[in-house]
Amino acid sequence: MRYCGSKARFMKDLAPILTKHLDGTNTFVDAFMGGANVISYIAYPKKIGIELNKYVFALWKEIWVNSRIGVTPERWIPETITRKQYDFIKNGYINNDDLLSLWYNDWEIGYVGTCCSFGGAWFNGYAAYNKKKKEDHIKEARN
């Protein structure tokens, strides 16, 4: 997942520091999971990821559950999110609209709020197709 504040580019240097005290009896805790770049980089059997944003947490939970039963993202993540859908979900979230949960699951709100947002930042604007670079950020998020 592309996520604002990603530590992915620092992992080569961070990993030795973060794993220095892991001895097989303790647990690695990623206290700021976000895009899960840290926890996915650490090769260690006992790991816990903590995410404060309930929608991002729900998205990771959905990914985990589906991966355990062999359901690939192509089968459950929407192929596209239109600007209209993005704006509807964003406005519902901002206005704390209870009706939003009737239309969308928490994981869907998490997906749209991060994966379909510019730079992966929480509802930072619709990640539209970039004609100049020929990048489809919505399609990339799904893959």
PLM region descriptions:
Residues M1-M33, N37-V38, I42:
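S-adenosyl-L-methionine
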Residues P45-N143:
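Class I S-adenosyl-L-methionine-dependent methyltransferase module
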